């Protein structure tokens, strides 16, 4: 059961994973994290669980996030397993299968120097000096892990007209052009989260 069904829902919730089933018989749940940064899931004092709506579903409304206190959580291979307050048997844990796990951004531990939470990189303008002076070439749409390091998926953009907004560059079929950039020191020169900007030396040739 939720710890507080009527608790005010934070406005800064970040989805960090999905519950993919029960773990054991004592009410523990197993979570598949969305990224390698699962330490936030393990350290957060509360999770907010939401049942999302499939993209093709019609007439279905997503459930409101409900808060569950985390009694304990630990890594289990590539997953995270956790005991939530009020969930005491396998049937209750299985009932949570498929729910999105969200955590308030305010609960994230402070990142170490030269380390960044992936969620903070999404939406940053991406610049490169590969052709000389730094130029904005796109925006970070997604961050994922390739097993060795993080990868930025950058949607390429055209330079905006005066007073306008950047627009995606597209191929002959109208699909947005993208590039994948290793998030490593050899190519990422600077990250300024306050300015929402990432500078690199990555070439933009496709």
Curated annotation (Swiss-Prot):
Keywords: Chaperone, Cytoplasm, Ribosome biogenesis, rRNA processing
One of the record's GO molecular function terms: ribosome binding
Compartment(s): Cytoplasm
Segment forming the signal sequence: none
Primary location recorded for the protein, binned into one broad class: cytoplasm
Example of a GO cellular component annotation carried by this entry: ribosome
Residues in PRC barrel domain copies: 113-206
InterPro entries reported in the protein's UniProt record: PRC_barrel-like_sf, PRC_RimM, RimM, RimM_N, RimM_N_sf, Transl_B-barrel_sf
GO biological process, one term: rRNA processing
Oligomer status and interactors: Binds ribosomal protein uS19.
Family of the protein in this entry: Belongs to the RimM family.
Comment text on domains: The PRC barrel domain binds ribosomal protein uS19.
Name of this chain's protein: Ribosome maturation factor RimM
Originating species: Bordetella petrii (strain ATCC BAA-461 / DSM 12804 / CCUG 43448)
């Amino acid at each position: 059961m939720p710890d507080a069904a009527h608790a005010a829902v934070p406005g800064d919730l970040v989805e960090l994973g999905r519950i993919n089933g029960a773990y054991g018989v004592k009410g523990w749940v197993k979570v598949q994290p969305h990224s390698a940064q699962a330490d936030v899931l393990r350290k957060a004092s509360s999770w907010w669980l939401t049942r999302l709506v499939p993209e093709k579903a019609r007439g279905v409304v997503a459930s409101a996030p409900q808060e569950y206190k985390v009694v304990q959580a630990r890594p289990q291979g590539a997953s995270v397993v956790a005991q939530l307050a009020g969930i005491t048997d396998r049937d209750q844990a299985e009932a949570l299968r498929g729910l999105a796990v969200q955590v308030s951004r305010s609960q994230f531990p402070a990142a170490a120097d030269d380390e960044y939470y992936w969620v903070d990189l999404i939406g940053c303008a991406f610049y490169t000096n590969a052709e000389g002076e730094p130029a904005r070439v796109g925006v970070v749409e997604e961050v994922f892990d390739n097993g060795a390091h993080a990868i930025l998926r950058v949607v390429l953009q055209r330079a905006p007209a005066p007073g306008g907004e950047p627009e995606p560059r597209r191929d002959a079929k109208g699909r947005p052009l993208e590039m994948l950039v290793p998030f490593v020191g050899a190519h990422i020169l600077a990250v300024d989260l306050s300015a929402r900007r990432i500078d690199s030396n990555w070439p933009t040739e496709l």
